[in-house]
Amino acid sequence: MTPSIIDTHTHPFDAAFDDDRTEVMARAAEAGIATMICPAIDSASHDSLFALCDSYPDMCRPAMGLHPTSVNDNPDWRNELDIVASYISNACNRRFYAIGEVGLDFYWSRNWQKEQTEAFEAQVCLSLEHNLPLIIHTRNAWPEMLDVLRTFKGGGVRGVMQAFS
């Protein structure tokens, strides 16, 4: 019997898979991947995310969020958060399975630490409001991540960590 595996974080909708996406998805299924949680990165990723989930409805589950590096040097990041909140509030009649990919990433720079932290906190609040788990991305920001999560201690925050250092 092949194991039934859930991949809690994957981006097969990325353009890097445009040439062999069908084969990638078939290999995943053959390997026992039953479900893939596919987190958004920013609004530029939404169309390809939704197309993938529509093409593989029995396997792919969308997650909605704003990746921390999509906040960097982006004057419209608050608008991006509004788009995330609108989708989560069911503006598109889709079910989302998590809030993600969210978090803090200071690997490249700390110049946007304040903005990333604000965006992450807002998305933690969204996850609590809608009772959805988080898909948390953390690079070179572990102490700061713990500081944010501690502010929600006892509040029911849940999810998975990925890309952490």
List each language-model region with its residue ranges:
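Mid-domain alpha/beta scaffold segments of enzyme catalytic cores
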Residues: 1-165
